């Protein structure tokens, strides 16, 4: 410091630097008004009085997140206090009856009032009455909400939980988290029977077997994977965490999930629930199988022959066509029939080879149209032929050659010679 002469017989002192304190509570300086306000707050904390007005009307608000249950009865809220002795808290005892709890179902909040923080604030220095204050303990039990699929690092308290004075938050509580067991989902799927050539949509057959609302699946991704008998992935349905629905992705994007197997095929659908955060619990999966049974159609071809003199051993040739494609060729005798199996649905035409059986006239121009479908899987085609008699010259036919000479003499049986007509 420096001394300076203020007047006759008077001396004053001027501060040239602050004292370098080694601990708190003794010497504080301020450079501006904000620092000055902080000084008085610090002094208040150290001389043993509350620096914020938190009387018995103060509200302690604990808002439970929607992933856990809220107590239905305020009587389930356990209220107690523990007295501080300057170094540790004593055993909890029941709180004064003036401290009460209430539940607000609309906001899922547990509200506690009646504890006077001004009177009971905790300090390391004894107060004027020799006490060190006490803390308020609020306890209640919660359980996982029904339908919640779990996950890691799930918050138990809403971020608006804290201490409120006159409706204003004074201090927010820390937000603790809890790892919650990840629940599995067992999918289901319908079996289906189709006919060869028909199709089935896998999206219509697979059932999620769960409802997602964005809250019950807030911390897990859910994926349904459909595979064929060879283990190849046909499609996946994914519901991202926090979403109420998902999207299908197919290995054959143009198919839209439609398949047309040529033989009976069994598929597997697996539902995997995966936590989005690291922690105690990992992904869980459940699967189910379903079968698309493929039946085939049949076509019966019959031959009838009319007309006297028909050859009982005459054969008739038929070509079975599907569009421009030859399906098969069959040969029948009169009065016989045959059944072609393993056919797909569609339009067929049975065409008789009339050149083969040229001496027989076929009705309907030798054609018969048949449509096979899931409602009429077994079709029939009949063609009737009529025998037409033809008289033909053969090597055994006798011919009489009759001619007359110029002299009008009948020369039947004689070889003509010179001088004849």
Each language-model region and where it sits:
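Solvent-exposed loop/turn and edge beta-strand elements of beta-rich ligand-binding domains
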Residues: 4-10, 14, 18-421
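Venus flytrap/periplasmic-binding-protein-like
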Residues: 1
